[in-house]
Amino acid sequence: MTLIKSISGIRGTIGGHVGEGLNPLDIVKFTSAYATLIRKTTTVKSNKIVVGRDARISGEMVKNVVCGTLMGMGFDVVNIGLASTPTTELAVTMEGACGGIILTASHNPRQWNALKLLNEHGEFLNKEEGNEVLRIAEAEAFEFADKIGRAHV
């Protein structure tokens, strides 16, 4: 099992023990850290986060965990389903969203998946933002919402 945590996202082989592979608990942890960062830094008035994914066999499970976590953190989720990285990036700006998550491990083998994190401009997080997501996740310093978000398709 492999879990790689970097400023460009969280990627790994699906399954395994916490911290050793990309399993549902790790997905919740890093999605919650990302949601906390977005809540602190966005200048967009929207409460939406776009989620798109590739066709990997684990994609449906990862999408469900990510979307449920984002809603639990108080964000409205725009699930665009199967979508390329550029399509998801563009959807962030077209939806007026405060961020986006692309579920794809790109060139990695099929047993891998990843969370690629976008800002309100549909761009990958910069080094400082990526490091802050990792810091929040490590400290479990999440900021929870008073109200649950909704899902949009």
Question: Which ranges hold each PLM region?
Answer:
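An N-terminal, well-structured beta->alpha segment
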Residues: 1-68, 72-73, 150
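Gly/Ser/Thr-enriched, mixed-charge loops and adjacent short helices
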Residues: 13, 113-152
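Alpha-helical scaffold segments in soluble metabolic enzymes
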Residues: 29, 33-36, 87-90, 132, ...
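Pocket-edge positions in alpha/beta enzyme catalytic cores
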Residues: 19-22, 80, 122-125
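Generic alpha-helical secondary structure signal
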Residues: 25, 86, 127-131
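Ferredoxin-reductase
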Residues: 43-121
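Short, surface-exposed, polar/charged, turn-prone segments marking secondary-structure boundaries
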Residues: 32-34, 77-79, 106, 127-133, ...
